[in-house]
Curated annotation (Swiss-Prot):
Membrane topology: Peripheral membrane protein
Organism of origin: Geobacter metallireducens (strain ATCC 53774 / DSM 7210 / GS-15)
Cofactor-binding details, from the entry: Binds 1 [4Fe-4S] cluster.
Protein's name according to its UniProt entry: NADH-quinone oxidoreductase subunit B
Keywords, ordered alphabetically: 4Fe-4S, Cell inner membrane, Cell membrane, Iron, Iron-sulfur, Membrane, Metal-binding, NAD, Quinone, Translocase, Transport, Ubiquinone
């Protein structure tokens, strides 16, 4: 959020997109979706040692209150529809963080029942590798997500009109 021009002693102007992005990056509310051992490290990240509140990150248990989902652990094909339903229940804008080798690429489980990376089903914004990644790695990934949010040029959603959507569908 760059300051455009100071106006006297009382006013500072800035772009509205920058202000909205600053507010969004300063209030990320991730929904925890722990599926395996990475969930333990995610819980450790939320402990007082790391103090996520100072970054505006507050864990939520409901998808309707969250704007970010952290997929932590092995995603099985049986669990995938549940994850997709939870993702669809989240309000826009929403972000996805893949935590751990299993969520990023399937990990060591190259089998018919494991999804080989959550990016096959959801648009992932940040990948955090490791087996399991340390709490500091998750914190670093969330800070990188904040950086990505600040660089977003289209803060107010898609600008595609209804007519353009209908034309592309035909």
């Amino acid at each position: 959020m760059g300051v455009d021009q100071p106006l006297g002693d009382s006013f500072i102007t800035a772009s509205l997109d920058g202000l909205v992005n600053w507010a969004r990056k300063s209030s990320i509310w991730p929904m925890t979706f722990g599926l395996a051992c990475c969930a333990i490290e995610m819980m450790a990240t939320g402990a007082s040692h790391n103090d996520l509140d100072r970054f505006g990150i507050i864990f939520r248990a409901s998808p309707r209150q969250a704007d970010c989902i952290i997929i932590a652990g092995t995603v099985t094909k049986k669990m995938l529809p549940v994850i997709q339903t939870v993702y669809e229940q989240m309000p826009e804008p929403k972000w996805v963080v893949a935590m751990g080798a299993c969520a990023c690429s399937g990990g060591v489980f190259d089998t018919y029942s494991v999804v080989q990376g959550i990016d096959e089903a959801l648009p992932v914004d940040v990948y955090i590798p490791g087996c399991p990644p340390r709490p500091e790695a998750l914190l670093y990934g969330l800070i990188k997500l904040q950086d990505k949010i600040m660089k977003d040029k289209n803060s107010f959603g898609s600008t595609i009109g209804l007519g353009q959507r209908l034309e592309s569908a035909a």
